[in-house]
Amino acid sequence: MAKRSKVGKFFTPKTVISGIVILIAIAAAIGANVIVPYDPNEVDPRSCFLPAFSKGHILGTDKLGRDLLSRLIMGAKSSMLNAFLIVAFEVVIGVPIGLICGYYGGKIDAVIMRIWDVVCSIPSLLLSFILIAIFGRGNFTGVMSIGIAFIPLTAKMARSLIITEKKAVYVEAFKSMGYLDMKIIFFHILPNVITTMIAQFTMDIGAAIVAMATLSYLGLGIQPPDADWGTLLENGMQNFYNNYVLLAAPAIIIMLVTVAVNIFSDCIQEYIDPSQRKLPTFKQYEKRLIHIRRRQKAAI
């Protein structure tokens, strides 16, 4: 039996399934304005609380007669875009700070890391609440507050990676050749450690979706009539007894997408670092042993 290629080992069933879920969410976000069957903010008093599978409304309508499917698709645009913006913000700010602090070390590194330790001791959502209380509620403030809350962990991760990598022989060689420190950090060290960071950044997308949905659920994120999955969840909670799908649909979507993102990030981590792969169970060992014995008998 031929061994699978390195790329083939990555495309396991769980990788493919989780990847499909993520691609569907991204496709819905990108094409939201085109594929929505109705205007998500169009009010129709004659169609309030229509149940699922009603004529023209697959998932029914809310208390204002707005099509739930259209609002979920448009909510995907807001939720996915916000999640990617949050991760982009933490990467652009956190990674350079962590790399520079780890490369140079010294008192500045010690002071900045102690500040990050204090910030990390505050739960991300609590820190977001504090920032929103200072700067006001809204989608932009929500994205920035969560992004700021995520920066310390990203910076600490980048710092820990470069502390190990800067001792490599190639770094010493570049130093002896007179290369600028910034060029060594961002053009030579960063490409060698970025693969380790990718799995964490992928997982942060799922965390960002949940965090932003939480803020919107509490009325601190995106404001009506615009919708994301958090506002739809809050609206469904208020009107659960009139149409349970209003609550179930956004809850299931948030769960599916975040679980898919986490599984996909685990797959990336296992692919990058084979030592992270789970050990086979006893039954799997037994099946392999039986397979080997059968091949040996066939060969005889």
Give short role names for the model-derived ranges.
Residues K77-I93, S128, M182-T214:
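Transmembrane alpha-helices
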Residues M1-Y38, I115, V193, A298:
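N-terminal signal-anchor/first transmembrane alpha helix
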Residues I58, D62, L68, I93-G94, ...:
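Generic hydrophobic transmembrane alpha-helix motif, especially the helices
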Residues I132-I134, L161-I162, M203, A211-I253:
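Glycine-rich helix-loop "coupling/hinge" segments at transmembrane-helix boundaries
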Residues T61-R66, Y103-Y104, A173-K183, F187-N192, ...:
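Short helix-to-coil transition segments within interhelical loops
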Residues T12, A28-K63, L220-D226:
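Hydrophobic alpha-helical transmembrane segments of membrane transport/permease proteins
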Residues T195, T202-M203, Y244-I300:
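C-terminal transmembrane helix and the adjacent membrane-cytosol boundary/short C-terminal tail
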Residues L68-Y103, V257:
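Transmembrane alpha-helix signature in integral membrane proteins
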